[in-house]
Amino acid sequence: MSNCAPAIERRFINTPRARIHIATAGEGRPVLLLHQTPRSWDEYRDVLPRIGRHYGAIAMDTVGFGDSDALSFEENSIEAWSACAFDLLDALGLPQIAVVGHHTGAAIAIEMAAARPERIAAVALSSPPYVDAERRSRHAGKPVIDQAPRTADGGHLLALWRMRQPYYPAGDTDLLDRFIVDALKAGPLAAEGHRVVNRYEMDTRLPLVRCPVRVVAAAADPHAFPVAGKVVGAIAGASLVEIAGGMVPFPDQMPEVFAETVLAFLAHAYPVRSNDMTRRI
């Protein structure tokens, strides 16, 4: 463990389905960080060095977001995104990892733990959605946030800003600027990513998760906070911690608190091992 924050390094990894962009920091046991829709690794820009003091932290751009290649539009699903994450782990030679996911990233983390339990040692779910039959039915065919068709006068930029502004700290511009950049890069997936989550049969997958799980509930997130207890109740042995003041952009809104919360969980569920401390990602 180092007291100095490690530098962030970025690169592309070729995998069977897509060329995937990652950002890494630190050395040691690998921890994969998965972002929300329509963000990118940048959501963890200030988290990576903090986790990288103790672990080999990897933030990937989910396929179709950030700088990662996209799948064909019809292929997009939580299951496909999970499979692409495993492709990345295979390419990096990582047989087992811990996973941290926020919003959409939490849904992908759940699928990874359910699909390949032998490869997932621990999972931290930050503001996870809870998708059951009722939610799938309620959202089918309905408009979603970040649905802002392009207009010649640039009105879609203001529409995106105004849709997201209520869920960000009052007076913020920096976090919203970062969101806008990622939303524009994602193109149609900025909205489709939310539909992908709403189609996911999460309720059938949660009981299959067997590794240690910590649900981190941002208390000022009006979408995820009310259902945090349902996620915890559906996973045997899962625990819950609530974060006062945490909002939808929790990882980049409160990076120090986010990292400390994740590290406190990993210290018990996925402890640092001396023989892994010099392992580079």
Please place each PLM-identified region on the residue numbering.
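Conserved alpha/beta-hydrolase catalytic His-Asp/Glu region
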Residues: R135, R150-L208
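Active-site loop/oxyanion-hole signature of alpha/beta-hydrolase fold enzymes
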Residues: R45-D46, I58-V100, T104, E256, ...
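N-terminal cap/lid segment of alpha/beta-hydrolase-fold proteins
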Residues: M1-R19
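Short beta-strand/loop motif that positions the catalytic acidic residue
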Residues: V209, V215-A217
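Conserved alpha/beta-hydrolase "acid-adjacent" motif
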Residues: P222-V227
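Catalytic active-site module of serine/aspartate enzymes centered on a nucleophile-bearing elbow/loop
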Residues: A238-I281
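Flexible "cap/lid" loop of the alpha/beta hydrolase fold
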Residues: I110-A115, A121-A152
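Conserved HGGG/HGGXW glycine-rich cap/lid loop of the alpha/beta-hydrolase fold
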Residues: P16-D69
